[in-house]
UniProtKB/Swiss-Prot annotation:
The lineage of its organism: Eukaryota, Metazoa, Chordata, Craniata, Vertebrata. InterPro entries: CEP128 (IPR026652). The keyword DNA-binding does not apply. It comes from Homo sapiens (Human). Residues 1000-1009 have a biased composition (Basic residues). This is Centrosomal protein of 128 kDa. Residues 1-29, 115-140, 319-345, 987-1018, 1067-1094 are annotated as: Disordered. The modification Phosphoserine is found at S31, S249, S291, S331, S1061. Transmembrane segments: none annotated. Residues 328-342 have a biased composition (Polar residues).
Length: 1094
């Protein structure tokens, strides 16, 4: 644009030079003074040509600077787009995960759940979990009935934890995005303030020009001063941009340092975790070694018992061989009774010794059997008790951890929602401020138009005065003076221009350095993006592993239940076997009562009494252990009460923090009100100045009419008046300088306020870092839970192997007992027959001995007493079993109460979440209203652009009329020289003013177009996110539907119809916004074409 304006000026200068040269040659023949005048005019033209060339160079430099600024803006927009794309990707991943969690619950819902709910309750998707329906209370009640606390299947609780964790991450990402938007709005506000100040300065300068009808030299000097001011403002802008870029680079470096520190902390935490896991592994290995040693010891004891049983078997075989030999000897002795009576007595003694040995062996066998039975039963009972205790402890520990995690997540969500509310209020305040600023800009633009009209009228009157001055000879002297002044001013301007070129070169070097820094920052940002993607992939892998672990845990718990049922069956079968053993023992005792061996029975009863006493001692020990467990449970309840008190204290602290934040918001609102009052005062001042300028213009018109009637008298008066106005202008400049100082002070105050806002942003960033640390703690807890689950799996596998071994050993012992019982029955039958035969033989000869032998056992032993004692013992055991069952019932009742409390807590949490999501829906409605207001503002801007086009057409018509008037004046031969001189000066001034006006107009249009582009990009991205969300939800609904009927119901449900309506609504505003952008581009291109034509 700058190049086109310079080229048009070049062609105009060429057209002007050719008639000037012809006229100079024509006058050369007349007289020598005219030659001197022509030489002076030629020098002026050469200087003007130089100035035009310099102006072209300046225009080129400005064009390059604009291109560079456009490129820089494009790079910044590219960065914004990349950031927004990353945010959209994170949102899409979050939506996919949330939709995955929702699809699991969709299969469990019925058709009534999908059909329930009104449109107002279902048509709002909250940002954290958009696929959840928080408006249907019946569906919540149904989910409550399903999602009770179950220790068999705890996947529901874990999915809720995943949902909370994802919502935390989404809220943190939204906080970061809102912070970036807040910083953008601050920068935009500062730019708009600078532009308003610049416009006000231009207005004051133009109004001063309208007031003062100065000579062309003064006007040229003023124009040069304006150029210097503009260059200074551009320098200041460049310096500010450099400072901003430096601050941005410093902020990015600080952020990188923080991220590196966080990464180092994360690595240290991971190393600590690895060390803890290694120590835990070592402890587990030690425990396994101890368990192996105990198993080896138990196996060694079993092997010794088996060896003892085998030795007893060998002894029994030997005894059978001895018995057979004795039978043979008894048959021989029965034949030779008469001859061998002495030998018979010895044989009888020997038999008694053998029988005593047999009785001792049988006692040992019975003792060993009882020991084996009791050892097996005790070991199995102890193992079962240990397993149950461990499971109960683990379940209680997991429940406490889940409660702590849910509480922490709730606190974090509350804090983040509060932060979101604050940020939304701040955004609304900034939107109102921007609307007011736009209104003020429009008023300022109207004032500038009126001032331009006034300046044009003043120029017309000046042209008439110049025509009157051309009739007099004194004008030539003044012209020479003006030429000298113009030459001096042009020389000064050249020097200043050279200085400015040097400054621009320095600025270009600094800009190149800044571009290098920006490229480095972009590379670092790409690396950070790659790290983010890697972290997200790791999180997804961890989630998959957690789901696998949960499924494995559910399967293991089902296997444990099946194993418990098997153990119960085994216990019942064992009780049956014990009854059978008891029956067999009763038969044995009956046979022994028939054989009247009461001495043997007394010894057995003594041994059994000792064993029963040992069992009683063991039962007492178990009772003491149960009491200790009860005390531990009471202590755990006390700890839980202390934790609740701590949580109450934390809630009180959070409320205090909330009050402090509300105070800060009230301060911000007060500051905004003060700014609004300042803008109102400025607007009133501008209106007053406008009225004053209009009055002065009226006075000027009346004075110009009087000047036409009185030429020579009024010229002197005008000179005096001009001098007075110069003094007034100097005074006015001083007042303006004082006002500029005041404005600088106000700018310092605003900077202080901005620093306060930055400090608040830093506080918000610190809170975000705290939330990230909390997320890290949750990850640590998640890894600890994972390690505990792996340890449980190992422990369950070890228990399964131990149970299998015990079952094999029990079967082997059963087989051995059956063999021993059969052998015992056969041996006792043979012994009974032999004893009966011996008793018959001895009763023939010695009846008295038989009476003494039979009477002894009745005195020493009574079987009825033994039965009574055994019955009392059995009754006592039954009573103890009943007491233990009552204790178990009480503990189960307590567990049920705890579960009910947990259910109530979960229901309360769900109600709170519903309230929060309703608040979020209200805020979304407010955002929709704000978008509508923005569309109305865009329509108003379009109308104003059309008005600008009409005004430009009027300006072009005025320019054409002025050209026609100038052509008419050129027809007069005497006024040609004066008109050409003034025309050159006026064209140079007008060309510079046009370049300035075009630059300001194109800058305003560029800002408006960039604003529209940002809005359209944001809308398209929101539409894309909504479309991906809708596609994901639709596909998941199809995948997880139970049948084609459920699919048809889902499509006919109000939710799906709302989705379709939502997509239509999002497409319509985007198309409207595209049309608006097209109209804006068209309106902006029309004035450009008109300016090119001019």
């Amino acid at each position: 644009m700058a190049e086109s304006s310079s080229e048009s000026d070049h062609f105009r200068c060429r057209d002007r030079l050719s008639p000037w040269a012809a006229r100079s040659t024509h006058r050369g023949t007349r007289s020598l003074p005219t030659v001197e005048v022509t030489e002076k005019v030629n020098t002026i033209t050469s200087t003007l040509q130089d100035t035009s060339r310099n102006l072209r160079q300046v225009d080129q430099m400005l064009g390059r600077y604009r291109e560079y600024s456009n490129g820089q803006a494009g790079a910044i927009e590219h960065l914004k787009e990349s950031l927004e794309q990353s945010i959209d990707q994170l949102r899409s991943q979050r939506l996919l995960r949330n939709s995955g969690g929702r699809s699991i619950s969709v299969t469990s819902l019925s058709a009534s759940d999908l059909d329930g709910g009104t449109g107002s309750e279902l048509h709002h998707f909250p940002p954290t979990s958009p696929l959840k329906d928080y408006g249907d209370p019946q569906g919540i009640k149904r989910m409550r009935s399903r999602t009770g606390v179950r220790f068999v299947q705890e996947t529901d609780d874990m999915t809720q934890l995943h949902g909370f964790h994802q919502s935390l991450r989404d809220l943190s990402s939204e906080q970061i995005r809102l912070g970036d938007d807040f910083n953008r709005e601050l920068s935009r506000r500062s730019r708009s303030d600078a532009e308003t100040k610049r416009a006000l300065e231009e207005l004051t300068e133009k109004l001063n020009e309208a007031q003062k009808q100065e000579v062309v030299s003064d006007r040229v000097e003023r124009r040069l001063q304006e150029l210097e001011r503009e260059m200074r403002t551009e320098r200041e802008l460049v310096e500010r941009r450099q400072d901003q870029l430096g601050l941005m680079s410093l902020q990015l470096q600080e952020a990188l340092k923080k991220q590196e520190a966080k990464a180092d902390e994360h690595e240290g935490a991971i190393k600590n975790k690895l060390r803890q896991t290694e120590t835990e592994k070592n402890q587990l290995e030690q425990e396994l070694e101890l368990s192996r040693r105990l198993l080896n010891q138990s196996e060694g004891s079993r092997e010794t018992l088996l060896h003892q049983v085998e030795e007893l078997r060998t002894q029994l075989t030997k005894a059978e061989g001895d018995r057979k030999g004795l039978q043979h000897q008894v048959s021989q002795i029965s034949k030779q009774q008469s001859n061998y009576q002495d030998e018979q007595g010895e044989d009888w003694r020997f038999r008694r010794g053998v029988e005593r040995e047999k009785q001792d062996l049988e006692k040992q066998m019975s003792d060993l059997r009882v020991q084996l039975n009791f050892s097996a039963m005790a070991s199995e009972l102890e193992e079962v008790k240990r397993c149950m205790e461990r499971k109960d402890k683990e379940k209680a520990h997991l429940a406490s951890q889940v409660e702590n995690l849910t509480r922490e997540l709730e606190n974090g969500e509350k804090q983040q929602l509060q932060m979101l509310d604050r940020l939304k209020e701040i955004q609304n305040h900034f939107d109102t401020c921007e609307a007011e600023r736009k209104h003020a800009d429009l008023q300022i633009s109207e004032l500038t138009r009126h001032a331009e009209d006034a300046t044009k009228q003043a120029e017309r009157y000046l042209s008439e005065l110049q025509q009157s001055e051309a009739l007099k000879e004194e004008a030539e002297k003044r012209r020479e003076d003006l030429k000298l002044k113009a030459q001096e001013s042009i020389r000064q301007w050249k020097l200043k221009h050279k200085k400015l070129e040097r400054a621009l070169e320095k600025q270009s070097e600094t800009v190149d350095e800044l571009t290098g820094k920006n490229n480095q920052i972009l590379k670092e940002k790409d690396e950070l993006k790659t790290q983010l993607y890697a972290a997200l992939q790791q999180i997804e892998n961890l989630r998959k592993e957690l789901n696998d672990v949960l499924t494995k845990r559910a399967l293991q718990e089902e296997e444990l239940h099946s194993k418990e049922e098997k153990l119960r069956d085994i216990k019942s079968h064992q009780a049956d076997l014990e009854l059978e053993v008891k029956n067999s023992l009763d038969t044995i005792h009956r046979l022994e009562s028939e054989l009247k061996k009461q001495s043997k029975i007394q010894s057995q009863m003594k041994v059994e009494k000792a064993h029963l006493e040992e069992e009683i001692a063991e039962l007492k020990k178990s009772q003491a252990q149960d009491k200790a467990k009860l005390l531990e449970m009471q202590e755990s309840i006390k700890d839980l009460s202390a934790i609740r008190a701590d949580l109450a204290n934390k809630l009180a602290e959070e409320e205090r923090a909330k009050k402090a934040v509300l105070k800060d918001l009230s301060d911000l609102t007060a500051q905004a009100k003060s700014r609004d009052e300042e803008t109102a005062t400025i607007i009133t001042q501008l209106k007053l100045e406008r009225d004053v300028h209009q009055r002065e213009l009226k006075d000027l018109t009346s004075s110009l009419q009087s000047v036409k009637t009185k030429h020579e008298q009024n010229i002197q008066e005008l000179m005096k008046h001009f001098k007075k106005e110069k003094s007034e202008a100097e005074n006015h400049i001083r007042t303006l300088k004082a006002e500029s100082l005041e404005e600088k002070n106000m700018a310092k105050i605003h900077r202080g306020q901005l620093e306060k806002l930055k400090s608040q942003c830093d506080r918000l960033t610190e809170e975000l870092t705290q939330n990230e640390n909390e997320n890290k703690k949750l990850k640590l807890k998640y890894q600890c839970l994972k390690d505990q689950l792996e340890e449980r799996e190992k422990h369950i596998s070890i228990e399964e192997e131990h149970l299998r071994r015990m079952e094999e050993a029990r079967l082997q012992l059963k087989d051995q007992l059956l063999c021993l019982e059969t052998e015992q029955e056969s041996i006792l039958g043979v012994i009974g027959k032999e004893i009966d035969a011996a008793c018959k033989t001895f009763s023939k000869d010695s009846v008295e001995k038989l009476k003494v032998f039979s009477s002894g056992p009745d005195i020493h032993y009574d079987p009825h007493r033994w039965l009574a004692e055994s019955k009392t013992k059995l009754q006592w055991l039954c009573e103890e079993l009943k007491e233990r069952e009552n204790r178990e019932k009480n503990l189960r009742h307590q567990l049920m109460l705890c579960r009910q409390q947990l259910r109530n807590l979960t229901e309360n949490k769900e109600s709170e979440l519903q309230c929060l999501f309703q608040q979020i829906e209200r805020q979304e409605q407010l955002l929709d209203e704000i978008h509508r207001e923005k569309r109305d503002l865009l329509e108003e801007t379009q109308r104003k652009d059309e008005e600008m086009g009409s005004l430009q057409d009027r300006v072009i018509a005025l320019e054409t009329s002025t050209q026609v008037a100038l052509d008419h004046l050129e027809s007069v031969p005497e006024k040609l020289s004066l008109l050409e001189d003034f025309k050159d000066f006026r064209d140079s001034c007008s060309s510079s003013e046009r370049t300035d006006g075009r630059y300001s107009k194109y800058r305003v249009r560029r800002n408006s177009l960039q604003h529209h582009q940002d809005d359209t990009k944001y809308r398209t991205k929101s539409f894309k996110g909504d479309r991906t969300f809708l596609e994901g939800s639709h596909t998941r609904g199809l995948d997880h539907s139970s049948s084609w009927q459920d699919h048809s119901r889902f499509l006919s449900s109000p939710r799906f119809s709302y989705v379709n309506s939502f997509t239509k609504r999002t497409v319509a505003p985007d198309s409207a916004s595209n049309k608006e952008d097209a109209t804006m581009n068209g309106t902006s291109s029309q004035p450009k074409k008109e300016e090119y034509g001019s």
